[in-house]
Amino acid sequence: MELLCVRNVSKTFLDHSTKVCAVLDNSLDIHSGEMVAIIGPSGSGKTTLLNLMGIVLAPDSGEILVDGQKVNGLNDKKRCQMRNRYFGYIVQDFALIEEDTAMQNILVPTLYSKQKKSAAEYRRIIKDLAQKLQVSDKLKTKVKKLSGGERQRIAIIRSMICDQQIILADEPTGALDQENSVI
């Protein structure tokens, strides 16, 4: 069964008084363990499609199923619960709290996750990911003192800390140098 199923979704926005179609009749299936890349030029609707897939936005038409559950028509509380259960996000602008340390930022999703682990287990996961992404020495550093690439890697770790089944990444390597974008 598909973990994420997007069927004929469309989304329009109003730009002043003009209706702009950001996504038109898109469909895709993603199975557990699959990696899918959506590519296209700036302004082609990639971020909007990710927001539809991650149930941040509701489609104007079409349907979205997450782990076989239809998302269309769910109230805000149920949509939020589903997002927290299934999705990790890496957004273009990192969405990190500047005054907090990298570690504090990484731990934010654990406050909302139903998949509670022990503090020791979270430390083990963070240590492993930070080592792989070469930011072990930055975990106690305030985010405002990190480079763009370091912030990006902290955002990547944050998206993975709760073992989410689906990671949605909007330009996840945009701030990384060539060496680190391969990791």
PLM feature spans:
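Conserved catalytic motifs of ABC-family nucleotide-binding domains
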Residues: 163
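Conserved ABC ATPase signature
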Residues: 142-146, 150
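Catalytic Walker B motif of ABC-type/P-loop ATPase nucleotide-binding domains
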Residues: 167-170
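Helix-to-loop junction immediately C-terminal to a conserved catalytic motif
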Residues: 54
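Conserved ABC ATPase "signature" region
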Residues: 70, 119-138
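Short coil-to-helix segment of the ABC ATPase nucleotide-binding domain corresponding to the Q-loop/switch region
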Residues: 99-109
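Conserved ABC transporter NBD signature motif
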Residues: 62-70
